[in-house]
Swiss-Prot record:
One of its GO terms (biological process) is regulation of circadian rhythm. Gene3D superfamilies: P-loop containing nucleotide triphosphate hydrolases. Disruption phenotype: No visible phenotype under photoautotrophic conditions in continuous light or in a light/dark regime with or without 0.2% glucose. Growth in the dark (with glucose) is more impaired than in wild type. The modification Phosphoserine is found at S423. Belongs to the KaiC family. Its EC number is 2.7.11.1, 3.6.4.-. Seems to be linked to dark adaption of Synechocystis cells, but is not as essential as the core oscillator KaiAB1C1 for the circadian cycle. KaiB3 and KaiC3 may cross talk with the core oscillator. Autophosphorylates and dephosphorylates independently of KaiA. Has a weak ATPase, hydrolyzes 8.5 ATP/monomer/day, has no detectable ATP synthesis activity. ATPase activity reduced 55% by KaiB3 monomer but not the KaiB3 tetramer or KaiA in vitro, reduced 35% by KaiB1 tetramer. It comes from Synechocystis sp. (strain ATCC 27184 / PCC 6803 / Kazusa). It catalyses: L-seryl-[protein] + ATP = O-phospho-L-seryl-[protein] + ADP + H(+); L-threonyl-[protein] + ATP = O-phospho-L-threonyl-[protein] + ADP + H(+); ATP + H2O = ADP + phosphate + H(+). ATPase activity is influenced by KaiB1 and KaiB3 in vitro; ATPase is reduced 35% by the KaiB1 tetramer and 55% by the KaiB3 monomer but not affected by KaiA or the KaiB3 tetramer. This is Circadian clock protein KaiC3. The gene is kaiC3.
Length: 505
């Protein structure tokens, strides 16, 4: 058992990813915690995972079920890789089955024998030397009581019995609404020492799961709602954004962008641990920049990883081949890994966990994401910004160079790089733009931002052929390129304006 003491309160690590950070060390030892949520908010998974993590730490557990029979729970939890039947055989997990049995007549007020239930719980805890217990769900045993005072009295009696046993308990309770009354009867939260709310909110036709520690008697905890997700073979994974600290080291080492001309524009290349955002309209060359970024890394003996959310693997390989880059050979040599997923396959939290896992497993020196816009369209702005913060902070902690692409909504110009304003999070910004001149469509590139370094301020013309990107000379005597309204300015006017600035200086 791993205990921790905070503010005089001993704590038990739950082992649920992210929760022990939010709770400043885990659940208060020997106390009861209420997990409240609407149907489908993951209360039962939380209660089960609490016992699973305990077993993996050598702590036996008791699961008291009031709704689902043990057989159904065993089957439902098998998808997470939890073999409850085996743990039962080993005496590590025991059910106290208080669920309705076929043929049972409905309970009427005053008939439920709480004393008998408490006796069964006490017997199971003592026999199996359990230190953790989960009760799911309280509403099932108190639904026959119409008097809230009686509900409170019975709850207090149950909580007192658990406290006497010295076990750390999880009790789940049903909520009617995501925001409003904490519990169905309005008294459960007053009996429990701690209250945690899990939500599954529908916003903009998308589901978003969050967890909030509402009450933690006698000890500190993180405030507010935090996103979480449910993953096969893992269970609940909480993403505590407040755990992100700006303590990572900053490197002065430069890495190549894959283009000599762009390296010169950036003052000898990117910093090794920087996050670069490449923004431009469709077809301006963003994926080409990703390809050259990967090619430059592999040429220097670096391991490179690409997450593609718009194109299939075959398309990426074909496009790279067309620019003279052999992705297949790089993969054979183990220097490159290409991961292609459609954004719609899952939510952003799942994508983030998946990307973190792959980064930790492959251990790349460079990571590219093409494109953020594909992920932005399947999420809310809040979820998207949290995703970006979570991903960029993780990449920086690993001291990895990252290149993200973003598609601007306008073909010419653009008022904002993204609706989520992620430009403040990135270290460098490169803009790619179409430039319409004399009935011809050209391309322009500029380094808008390069944190900690001098860089070229010009907007330069570039072309694309079978050898990739070629950056040329600056656009001269042309204004309004970034706004999407390029206008030719006579040389005499340029000289006059330059003279005005010289006079002021």
């Amino acid at each position: 058992m791993i205990d921790q003491e905070t503010d005089g309160i001993e704590k038990l690590e739950t082992g649920i990813p992210g929760f022990d950070f939010l709770s400043d060390g885990g659940l208060p030892l020997g106390r009861a915690t209420l997990i409240a949520g609407t149907a489908g908010s993951a209360k039962t998974i939380f209660a089960s995972q609490f016992l699973v993590e305990g077993i993996q730490r050598g702590e036996n557990g008791v699961f008291v079920t009031f709704e689902e029979p043990p057989k159904a729970l065993r089957k439902n939890m098998r998808g997470f890789g939890w073999d409850i039947q085996q743990w039962e055989n080993e005496g590590k997990w025991v059910f106290v089955d208080a669920s309705p049995q076929p043929g049972d007549r409905p309970i009427v007020s005053g008939e439920y024998d709480l004393g008998a239930l408490i006796a069964r719980i006490e017997h199971a805890v003592r026999k199996y030397k359990a230190s953790r217990i989960s009760l799911d769900s309280l509403g099932a045993i108190f639904s026959h009581l119409s008097d809230s005072a009686q509900v409170r009295s019975d709850l207090f009696r149950l909580a007192s019995a658990l406290r006497e046993l010295g076990v750390t308990a999880i009790m789940t309770a049903e909520r009617v609404e995501e925001y409003g009354e904490i519990s169905r009867y309005g008294v459960e939260e007053f009996v429990a020492d701690n209250v945690v709310i899990v939500r599954n909110v529908l916003a903009d036709e998308k589901r978003r799961r969050t967890i909030e520690i509402l009450k933690y008697r006698g000890t500190d905890h993180q405030k507010g709602e935090f996103p979480f997700t449910i993953i096969n073979k893992k269970g609940i994974v909480i993403i505590p954004l407040s755990a992100i600290e700006l303590e990572q080291k900053s490197s002065d080492i430069r890495i190549t962008s894959g283009s000599e001309e762009l390296d010169r524009m950036c003052g000898s290349g990117f910093f090794r641990d920087s996050i670069i955002l490449v923004s431009g309209a469709t077809g301006t060359g963003k994926t080409l920049m990703v390809t050259e970024f990967m090619d430059g890394g592999v040429a220097n003996g670096e391991r490179c990883l690409v997450f593609a959310f718009e194109e299939s693997r075959e398309q990426l390989i074909r496009n790279a081949t067309g620019w003279g880059v052999d992705f297949k050979q790089m993969e054979k040599e183990g220097k490159l890994k290409v991961v292609c997923r459609y954004p719609e396959t899952t939510n952003l939290e799942n994508h983030l966990i998946m990307m973190k896992d792959i980064i930790q497993e492959f251990k790349p020196n460079r990571v590219a994401v093409d494109s953020l816009s594909a992920l932005e369209r399947v999420s809310t702005l809040k979820s998207f910004r949290e995703f970006i913060i979570g991903l960029t902070s993780f990449i920086k902690q690993q001291e990895i160079g990252g290149l993200f692409t973003s598609t601007t909504p306008n073909l010419l110009g653009g008022a904002s790089i993204t609706d989520a304003h992620i430009s403040t999070i990135t270290d460098s910004i490169i803009l790619l733009r179409y430039v319409e001149m004399y009935g011809e469509m050209r391309r322009g590139i500029t380094v808008l931002k390069m944190r900690g370094s001098m860089h070229d301020k010009d907007i330069r013309e570039f072309s694309i052929d079978h050898q990739g990107m070629h950056i040329g000379k600056p656009f001269r005597n042309v204004t309004g390129i970034l706004a999407g309204t390029p206008m030719y300015t006579a040389q005499s006017e340029v000289e006059r304006l330059s003279g005005l600035f010289d006079e002021k200086i």
